[in-house]
Swiss-Prot record:
Species assigned in the record: Neisseria meningitidis serogroup B (strain ATCC BAA-335 / MC58)
UniProt keyword annotations, A-Z: Metal-binding
Sequence similarity: Belongs to the GTP cyclohydrolase I type 2/NIF3 family.
Protein origin, superkingdom: Bacteria
The protein's name in its UniProt record: GTP cyclohydrolase 1 type 2 homolog
InterPro entries: DUF34/NIF3, DUF34/NIF3_sf
GO MF annotations, alphabetized: metal ion binding
Taxonomic path: Bacteria, Pseudomonadati, Pseudomonadota, Betaproteobacteria, Neisseriales
Amino acid sequence: MVLCRDFLTWCNETLQTALFKDYAPNGLQVEGREYIGKIVTSVTASRAAIDFAVEQKADLLLVHHGMFWKNELPTVTGWKKERIAALLRHDINMAGYHLPLDAHPTLGNNAQLADRLGFATEKRFGEQNLLNSGSLKQAKTLGALAAHIETVLQRKPVVIGNPEREIRRVAWCSGGAQGFFQTAIDEGVDLYLTGEISEAQYHLANETGTAFISAGHHATERYGVRALAESAAEVFGLEVCHFDENNPA
């Protein structure tokens, strides 16, 4: 067992949370028991994830998407009340790490995604260094790369571009980062990979010749929170369980 505050201090220092301008609080969002020995991870602090943490008798739920965001109504009602009530009823801490967890050079969502897809990271760039660029270890056609991504992430991606086009240089940013497509285009890459697509990206891809893949917000952000928890477990001797949902978004 370890003091929850010591665990949180380690996470905050490891992820350098103070360096980020975020639209969600990073760190403890719902306070539970003082000491923790078992952590459950999840992409999102959903009711299903909370129920799983209760079943596992976890002391802390560690997530990427917490429950509090800027520009939301500052009220605790409905589904939010039910989630928080379940955590408080069982004295479970809930901590969330958003942009700092996307950006960490080894534990972050972008780094972990690159490891799984075989991307060699060469550069971090863009807003708060949230984008990554690099090269494939071996060039692939867009169609072959999309098939590889589907196999690894277990989700069929949305692909915009000529499937026969050779892809060598890629840029990527996990989650809902389709708004950074122009930044990736300016970097001169062959492909931009992120988790979501909006209407405009279809036209940008066709008109600039830079391919675009949307591989799923949830699917591209599974791995950072797991890596963070497993790294903390080695430091503090914690037990870790991972929760996942079949979220198609």
